[in-house]
Amino acid sequence: HKSAKVNSIRTRNLIEQCDIAVVRFGEKYKQWNAAFDAGYASALGKPVVTLHDEALTHALKEVDGAAAAVAQTPEQVVRILGYAINGKL
């Protein structure tokens, strides 16, 4: 558990420094950690982009509701970030 605590310090620090938080949910990702990170970023006023399969849409409806954008593929995230940063799709 010590490494998890150290990692949480790093994660919190990176979220505090970010301009936009991209939070990925999926089979290989711990849902509760991702949900916590999304909530923390949102509480700090950071725009959140969620990334997850369509199968998780209902389960993540509250998280997606608080997100600035929702994506189902990494390519969609790239397009969202490109628009947010450069104003181009």
Predicted regions and their residues:
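Conserved catalytic or regulatory cores that recognize and/or transform ribose-phosphate-containing ligands
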Residues: H1-L89
